[in-house]
Amino acid sequence: LGMYRKGIIERIKQDKELNSNFVGGSARNREQLYALNLLKDDDVPLVSITGLAGSGKTYLTLLTAIADLHAGKYQRIVITRNVIPVGKDIGFLPGDMNDKMMPWIAPIMDNFRQGLKDKDLTYFNVMKDKGDIEIAPLAFMRGRTFNDTFLIMDESQNSTIHELKTVITRIGE
């Protein structure tokens, strides 16, 4: 497996593991290995991953973000997604913005739980309370700049080109 870079084909590193004190995971196939190498590559500022449901797109991205946060590469993780329901909408949700976003980030929470070594979401909640992880609705992206941030845009296939451009142009240093 190789990647074309600067006029040559470089061999993909076979390091399938992604471990820190808090999370652990590994690539299960060549596609995941390729995605993991792109996510871990500091020379690649934007990675877009496509695949079937359950292929590990969100899982690998989230684990990489947490490992990079703990390695000091980033100051925080921002997770966003479009709030477009699959079926009929259930209407307005009670609570503050975090409460309203919880049903939409349930897949991310599932992936976080899967990647945590102790399988307890307390760690996620502590990180969220400290501001290390932020849940940001796509509707409120305008005017923001994300410096020193690992930005995850989950389920981006539900977004328009305008929404995608809005998010991409928010990425700072």
Language-model features and meaning:
Residues 1-16:
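Interdomain "pre-motor" coupling segment immediately N-terminal to P-loop NTPase/helicase cores
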Residues 24-43:
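N-terminal pre-P-loop "Q-motif" helix
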